[in-house]
Amino acid sequence: MQPIMPAVGGGRQRLLGLYHALGEDIQATYIGSYDWPGELFRDQQLSPGLREIIVPLTVAHHEAARAAAESVEGRVVIDCMFSRQAHLSPEYLRVAREYMAHADVVVFSHPWAFPPLEADLKPEQLVVYDSQNVESILRTDLHGELASADDVLRVVVADEYALCRRADLILACSHEDREAFARLFKLDIEKMRVVPNGIFAFSHAVPDFESRCQAKSNLGLPGKPVALFVGSNYAPNNDAARFIANDLAKALPSVHFAIVGGCGAALAGMVVPDNVHVLGQLDELIKQQWLTAADVALNPLTQGSGTSIKMFDFMAAGLPVIATGAGARGIIRTGTRAFATVPLARTGAAVESLVTDDEVRRLMGAAGRKLVEDFYAWERISPRAGRLFQAFLRRKLEGVRTFTVLVPSYERPDHLERLFQCLVNQQERDFDVVVIDQSREPWAGRDRDWGFTLTYVHTPVRGAVKARNAGGELATGRIIAFTDDDCEPTPGWLAAARACFQSSSVIGVEGRVESDHMDTPDWRPVSNVGFAGLGFMTANLFAANAAFQHLNGFDLMFDEPHFREDTDFGWRLQELGEVPYCEDALVFHPAHRRDSERESSETRSRFFEKDAILYKKHPARYMTIFHAEGHWHQTEGFWSNFERGAAKYNVDITPLLERFRDVSFGS
């Protein structure tokens, strides 16, 4: 209901960020309007791939919207009632229909325009609902206490339900929203994907040490520790501003606290300490100076919903962030600490510790920047969305495949070539392939005709867990078949797995993995023979697509370095249904020489830090694999790295240490 530009507010920022660069061969046209009167028609190119056309609503439409608002005590409901009032703006509908007629993909960024345009959709068009919220829940929260709003809320729920049922693809901002949609409207989660909000992370470089010192001098704070908070005039932000001024600043007089944005109005009339700088709204240049000068950023919220976008701004600037649980809600956590989460009462101690520890600030700031680049940069989210549209459009036009074979790859082009020859030889032909290649150079075979559909993504984002989740996002087959780039599936691999899925109770399949050099110390064999149902290996694992989406993929805490993510996933998969072991779904995994850096015993033993997370999540099941594998008394370095992981991830392993540590092989 609003124009994209100027991109102020979360909704407009999402429209600009998400659609500005879907792909070199994808042109997006946004048809919008103004939710206020008196504006003119507008048509402009916002980026090479995004055009904005804004059609004003009529005077009659605005009068009807005002009447609707009066019926609900003056609350603005022009968006909620659009489907019932759109006929009053025929020019908007005409322009929308004109551009819809030539589109392959039609996206509704809210449910409001869907009902009046539903009849104009073509059967072959991909229909997408880009949900910025679960509107049925949000609007009920906003207006549910008003009896006079019942009719408005019925319209909202009816419109959103109709769009969700018609959509071929639903984009949700979070996994929690995805689950809410599935639960509320009884939807197939297989057609839903999480596409988060973000920021333009690459628009500013991370300041170096000299730049930070210069910025402090420019602001009159040379050599002083600076903590920064940014917030609009919104109740949770206002509470945070008062907490900083009344509590933190008084407890830490040597630290200067900068409060930026409309939340500063909450401090009007108060006498604040000298080390509090209430700055109000700043232009972008001055705001960047404070981001550069700060040593630490704060987000001490105690309430709120959704993701706090300011966290991404802080991390993109390379700032270490101290947040409460509410302040960090919904943000991905990997195996590297990208921000600190503390209770409100411990915020002061965390600030005091962080401003005096240059190395921790440097490491956390770098990790936060990397997190934003990997997951929350519009520059990467937009092409991801474009690939999603292409994958689901192909699914709609060509039909749903039985399998999507998912392959992460990193610097093994020759192995990848051998794997593809094995896929060419598969007896089962109803499959497509997704490769997420994190190598420095693209794979030479990416454009070859292999006899099956290949989606190839070359990405600078590193990490096997990230790669598998990225591939799972693009997977449109009913079953996702996981294997590795150095594996060699036998010709009957997919066919054998398909037979297992004939049972409706089967949600996944664990295939047999054989290796060579099984008893040679200079080699690391990879096999699950004799370990059925215990560890699981993504070298040969199948999962129903719906189950993968329901589980939100692999847990990224097992990344950096990646280890045990497949075990955790397999165990969670078993909670949804049966995951039998299939001898005939066979993959050969060549052993790796120990003299390479990636495969050395010292390098591999460091991965046992992830056992701490596995133990924390699945304490009873962990003990089964603990004893079956026997690393605790056979593998040098197990205990030292397990203990390191326990400290790193805050896991209490005292019972294991007391019972097993002294009788083990050693650390």
Regions found by a protein language model. Give the residues of each.
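A short, conserved alpha-helix in the catalytic core of glycosyltransferases
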Residues: 541-543, 547-552, 559-586, 591
